[in-house]
């Protein structure tokens, strides 16, 4: 989906729709594409654009120095472009190759019937071999220490030692919460069928020498 000039109301509406099921502009972690769009937006959007507002506040929580370290990404912005309607869905080549009913006279002979059955079987085989979509979620976790003397670097190292099938750790940073105490904010992507969020937070809380509590700051389906 191409997004037009985000300095216009229409462009912001397009961006809000684009971010409805995305945590970031490109991929599962923040990138230079987010920085580009963030600078174009310029200021926090109105509350009637909840997805843009959520994304804007998340990017704004990082410093300029942190943003410069992000990798490149693909921006959806099309300078000066008007929002484009979605292109018609391409026909599935597999479907085009299969004539479900064949052709011929009204009275099909045995050979025509055999050919049709073979085509139906080939079509069913092709459909059954297509990979199923894997449901994933992007999660932002707030991990809070006991006090300002907690070794936050070691706490992050402990959290990242957690390995589960379908779990991928992402970017992290320290966020001040007051009285000299910082919390660890860390991203992860999970496969919904393989990773239980409750089990993941319980495993983090098992590092009781470092961790006081774990909260889910943001949860988005991918």
UniProtKB/Swiss-Prot annotation:
Residues 78-89 have a biased composition (Low complexity). Residues 71-113 are annotated as: Disordered. PROSITE patterns: EF1BD_1, EF1BD_2. GO terms for cellular component: cytosol; eukaryotic translation elongation factor 1 complex. The keyword Cell membrane does not apply. EF-1 is composed of 4 subunits: alpha, beta, beta' and gamma. Belongs to the EF-1-beta/EF-1-delta family. This is Elongation factor 1-beta'.
């Amino acid at each position: 989906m191409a997004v037009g000039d985000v300095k216009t109301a229409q462009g912001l509406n397009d961006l809000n729709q684009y971010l409805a099921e995305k945590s970031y502009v490109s991929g599962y972690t923040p990138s230079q594409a987010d920085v580009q769009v963030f600078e174009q937006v310029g200021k926090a959007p109105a509350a009637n654009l909840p997805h843009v507002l959520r994304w804007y506040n998340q990017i704004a929580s990082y410093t300029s120095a942190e943003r410069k370290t992000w990798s490149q990404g693909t921006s959806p912005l099309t300078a000066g472009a008007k929002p484009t309607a979605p292109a018609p869905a391409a026909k599935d080549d597999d479907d085009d190759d299969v004539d479900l009913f064949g052709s011929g006279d009204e009275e099909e002979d045995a050979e025509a019937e055999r050919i049709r059955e073979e085509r139906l079987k080939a079509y069913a085989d092709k459909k059954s071999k297509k990979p199923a979509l894997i449901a994933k979620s992007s999660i932002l976790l707030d991990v809070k220490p006991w006090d300002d003397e907690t070794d936050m670097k070691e706490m992050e190292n402990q959290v990242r030692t957690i390995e589960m099938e379908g779990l991928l750790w992402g970017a992290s940073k320290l966020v001040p919460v007051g009285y000299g105490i910082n919390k660890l904010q860390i991203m992860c992507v999970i496969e919904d069928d393989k990773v239980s969020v409750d089990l993941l937070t319980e495993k983090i809380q098992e590092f009781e020498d470092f961790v006081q509590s774990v909260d889910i700051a943001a949860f988005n389906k991918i």
